Amino acid sequence: MPLLSVVIPFGLSKERSYIEERVLQKAKSFQSDENIEFIFVEGYSSKDHELKNFIQANHHIYLKDINQKVFSQGRCRNLGASYAHSNVLLFLDVDCYISLNNFEKILKLIQIKNISQNINALIVLPVVYLNKEANEKLKQYDEKFWDILIQEDLFTAKNTWVKFFAPSSTSSIVINKYQFLRLGGNDENFIGHGYEDFDFFARVLKACVSFEKMPTNLSYDARNWNFFNFKGFRSWFSLLGYEACFYGIYMYHFYHIE
């Protein structure tokens, strides 16, 4: 049994050709083995493709939600979780990148925290959102330098490549599979990509974590991650990602047209 199942939801369209490129890149660069498996889950796609064969040829799992009429990230995540062989899940959106070095750290933390048996244990990843220039400039460097390059740009506040920093990614969390399913997974009533991860993350925090102090007015949405006071649900969500920061574990979100 692998230590971790990584669920990657996607759906293709002619308007967003970069999605197919990013799925191909992930299927090619990731390696499913005895420690980690990658599950690519396709929701609704309006573009024909041959990704299934490519994904399976690279020894990953491919699933298709044939019932989707419009794309749903949440339904894809739930489907991937139900087919996962590991007792530990990580959800990775196609626009997001985690280095192989950080995957190794995550696997170690999964064992140290015993997440496969401890249903309340979590790893929440901080995410650095990159600007358009970073998409091309990073390719000029060996991939093993990407972590240091981006983190140096973030820490020095040069922001050559960094668009903004979110201390907590509400979509990419490492969680016990039983706990994910027990909490009902993502609400499948959400369509497209939106607040389905906020809804689920709030349920996770209430079930798994005790807080000495809660922010005021939880229903308030600051619409960004720059906090000057402890107010709103984003300030609550942000608390969990700093642990991974201390380990040097960051996730990076590549730019795309919104």
Regions found by a protein language model. Give the residues of each.
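N-proximal low-complexity "stem/linker" segments adjacent to membrane-targeting elements
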Residues: 1-25
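C-terminal catalytic/acceptor-binding lobe
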Residues: 20, 192, 196-258
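Acidic donor-binding segment of Leloir-type glycosyltransferases
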Residues: 23-66
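Glycine-rich, basic loop-to-helix element that forms the pyrophosphate-binding segment
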Residues: 67-84
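Short aromatic/hydrophobic "clamp" motif used to bind/position activated sugar donors
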Residues: 89
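Acidic donor-binding/catalytic loop of UDP-sugar-dependent glycosyltransferases
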Residues: 96-109
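Short beta-strand-to-loop element that shapes/binds the nucleotide-sugar donor at the catalytic cleft/hinge
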Residues: 119-140
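Short, flexible, basic/aromatic active-site loop/helix in glycosyltransferases
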Residues: 142-165
